[in-house]
Regions:
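Helix-coil boundary/capping segments in enzymes
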Residues: 1-310
Length: 310
């Protein structure tokens, strides 16, 4: 069915390969079994979780046609895994290596009732830019259908200096997000495609802290790029920053109505007690409720105000 997708299965270890490239990291067993997730959610007092796929499995390296078929395959199984579970909701995936096919599949997913999709920062797997003109059809549909687009960094951003000290996760993810989203800010995507809602994990990487510098770049190069300050106001962020002061800074820059509880479950670098950092920030009861679920309930069109997170 998928001639350019390889599966390595040894014991309880699964790895994927695409288009003759190297194998992915091992698939975390907790991504395949929802029972530990359900137990963890109950322990943490989480009512509803928004689930995207695993970026390593998205297959952006495949040809457009095979990539479309692979994305449909992933979506079918993700939707099936969350069907009948009121506390799990799915974000789909699209073949970002081709803007027209990504747009077509996004239309299908929205017709099926999904709130939106999770996409990677590099539309060709280990390279590419989200502001590439060939992706305009995807962004146009995202805006027209008022889709949620969760932008997640890829594994590594091509800098070999990150190969030591486990810095691919600690540093590289944030750099990848910052670079990718800075490009669509400068490209004016939030003005051109105002109907979509973009969500960033890990507190947006370095983006909130570099916003002043990004804006100053426009000041010294007038009339060349869109002002990032304008687009930034339309972005949502999660709370996976691990530090109460960092969270308070994020809220000050983005607004409390743009911040939602996140976890990065089940990955080791995720925040497995996600409410702790929010409570430690000393926010008002109203703001805490917004972060714990009210904002997510509105954004993802959940029936009740509840605790939603990724």
């Amino acid at each position: 069915m998928f001639p350019n997708v390889d599966l390595m299965h040894e014991g309880d270890t699964y790895k994927l390969g695409f288009a003759g490239g190297g194998l992915t990291r091992p698939l975390n067993p907790k991504l395949r079994n929802s029972e530990p997730r359900q137990i963890w959610m109950q322990e943490q007092g989480i009512d509803v979780q928004i689930n995207g796929g695993w970026l390593d499995s998205f297959g952006y390296e495949l040809s457009p046609d095979e990539g479309l078929a692979w994305s449909r395959f992933l979506n079918e199984h993700l939707i099936a895994a969350t069907k009948g579970k009121d506390n799990l909701r799915a974000l789909g995936t699209v073949p970002l290596q081709n803007g027209e096919k990504a747009a077509r599949l996004l239309e299908e997913l929205m017709d099926e009732g999904l709130a939106g999709v999770m996409i990677g920062t590099q539309p060709n797997g280990n390279h590419g830019n989200l502001d590439a003109p060939e992706l305009d059809p995807f962004w146009a549909v995202a805006s027209d259908r008022k889709a949620v687009v969760f932008i997640h960094p890829m594994y590594g951003c091509g800098d070999i200096r990150l190969n030591d000290y486990d810095m691919i996760n600690a540093v590289g993810r944030g750099l990848d997000t910052t670079t990718a989203v800075a490009r669509i800010l400068y490209a004016g995507h939030f003005t051109r495609y105002p109907g979509m809602s973009v969500v960033l994990p890990h507190g947006g990487g370095a983006l909130p802290w570099m916003l002043g510098r990004l804006h100053h770049n426009v000041v010294i190069h007038p009339d060349q790029y869109a002002d990032p300050l304008e687009g930034f106001s339309h972005i949502y962020f999660d709370t996976v920053v691990f530090d109460p002061d960092a969270l308070k800074f994020l809220i000050a820059k983005a607004g409390v109505d743009k911040v939602m509880l996140g976890s990065d479950y089940p990955f080791p670098i995720g925040d497995h007690t996600p409410k702790v950092v929010v409570k430690a920030a000393g926010l008002s009861e109203i703001d805490t409720k917004a972060i714990f679920g009210e904002t997510a309930a509105k954004l993802f069109k959940l029936e009740d105000s509840c605790v939603g997170q990724h």
